[in-house]
């Protein structure tokens, strides 16, 4: 892939240049230098554990799945021993339950409440901090903090598509986010193909899974049977190739290749949900006055859980804070949601004063105007907005109702 030309523009030129360099490196990783069939290798569970060790030795902070507070969440891990061995989960709308699988699978779950969004688009980002001094103030901190290199362990295909979408949001165009660019600058991704579908997943409908096809350095398929516990590995980048060379790997046997393909095929056949996307943009644009909006508004709490759990939602706001003595002030950027009244507040009131208008705005943007804005849907089919909605609202059911119910 050819390196893109850097356009010299006014404003934050340094940030724009850095962001475009990050995006070029990431897109380069999406194009393996050899066919996947030639890059297919197998490593044992012990060698997988060694892979995590060498990433730590190289200075990466490992972030991966672990069990905490009754859920499989993303957090800093020290190695394979922190992974959710033997755990899976049951998910339905408004319901999540951690379950024991009865085996030693490390990645035997679908997706938890956390996406990888927070790793790059942090929930809170300090912009500057100052202290009062001699009738004026002194800036204590300003600008983007240096970030350690990050290794994502166990990223699923839907979430890799979500990261690619957020790259478009934060790294392309004139408004480049410097904090996001700094976090994305050095990232190593160990993807895992899904071995089971969650009860609310519909990645097949969205074309985003269950097999990882982009944005990874290494993609693993976990196999656990009478021939042992092992991982079939696809290499997606030169850093990935180098890492595998350091731990050693064996050529994948035809039996393991077939077993790995069967794992992904079985997952695709057992999706918990489906959402046909044919004509979905036109459907949403034509449904502004659909009676279904009143129905969903009667159930929606406007709590913003769906937008917080969503791996692509990117609304934020800026706050100024002071300490109780008024001596120290800071400005921070934090996550916001289009479901809050303040999000659309302008002089004279809120543009979206009702829950009806806020839900309609969210769904229309996610599935329609997002396509016009960024060239892709804003939904990757992870199902988190269904699982973590306390009112048990199901986005796939709402879209189906818009298709079937009569318009006013």
Model regions: which residues?
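Iron-sulfur-associated redox domains of electron-transfer enzymes in respiratory
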Residues: 30-285, 290-293, 324
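A donor-sugar binding/catalytic signature common to diverse glycosyltransferases
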Residues: 305-312, 316-321
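Ferredoxin-type iron-sulfur electron-transfer modules in oxidoreductases and energy-metabolism complexes
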Residues: 277-298, 316-408
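Tryptophan (W) side chains
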Residues: 24-26
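Extended amphipathic alpha-helical segments enriched in small hydrophobics
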Residues: 297-307
């Amino acid at each position: 892939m050819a390196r893109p030309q850097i356009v010299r523009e006014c404003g934050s030129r340094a940030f724009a240049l850095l962001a475009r360099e990050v995006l070029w490196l990431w897109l380069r990783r999406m194009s393996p230098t050899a066919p996947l069939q030639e890059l297919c290798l197998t490593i044992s569970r012990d060698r997988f554990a060694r892979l995590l060790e060498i990433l730590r030795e190289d200075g990466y902070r490992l972030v991966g799945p672990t069990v905490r507070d009754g859920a499989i969440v993303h957090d800093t891990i020290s190695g394979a021993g922190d992974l959710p061995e033997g755990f899976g989960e049951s998910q339905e709308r408004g319901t999540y339950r951690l379950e024991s699988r009865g085996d030693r699978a490390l990645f035997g779950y679908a997706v938890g409440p956390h996406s990888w969004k927070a790793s790059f688009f942090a929930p809170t980002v300090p912009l500057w901090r100052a202290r009062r001094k001699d009738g004026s103030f002194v800036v204590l901190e300003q600008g983007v903090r240096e970030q350690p290199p990050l290794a994502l362990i166990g990223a699923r295909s839907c979430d890799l598509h979500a990261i690619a979408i957020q790259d478009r949001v934060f790294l392309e165009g004139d408004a480049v986010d410097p904090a996001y660019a700094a976090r994305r600058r050095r990232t190593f991704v160990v993807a895992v193909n899904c071995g089971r579908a969650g009860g609310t997943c519909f990645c097949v409908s969205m074309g985003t899974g269950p097999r990882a096809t982009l944005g990874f350095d290494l993609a693993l398929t976990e196999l656990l049977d009478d021939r042992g516990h092992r991982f079939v590995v696809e290499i997606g980048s030169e850093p990935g190739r180098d890492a595998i060379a350091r731990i050693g790997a064996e050529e994948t046997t035809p039996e393991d290749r077939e077993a790995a393909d069967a794992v992904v095929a079985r997952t695709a056949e057992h999706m918990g949900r489906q959402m046909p996307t044919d004509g979905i943009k036109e459907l949403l644009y034509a449904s502004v006055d659909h009676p279904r909006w009143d129905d969903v508004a009667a159930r929606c709490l406007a709590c913003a859980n769906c937008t917080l759990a969503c791996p692509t939602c990117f609304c934020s706001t800026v706050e100024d804070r002071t300490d109780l003595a008024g001596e120290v002030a800071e400005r921070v950027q934090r996550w916001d949601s289009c479901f809050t009244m303040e999000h659309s507040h302008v002089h004279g009131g809120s543009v979206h004063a009702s829950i009806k208008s806020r839900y309609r705005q969210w769904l229309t943007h996610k599935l329609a105007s997002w396509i016009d804005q960024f060239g892709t849907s804003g939904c990757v089919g992870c199902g988190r907005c269904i699982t973590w909605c306390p009112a048990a609202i199901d986005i796939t059911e709402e879209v189906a109702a818009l298709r079937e119910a009569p318009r006013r």
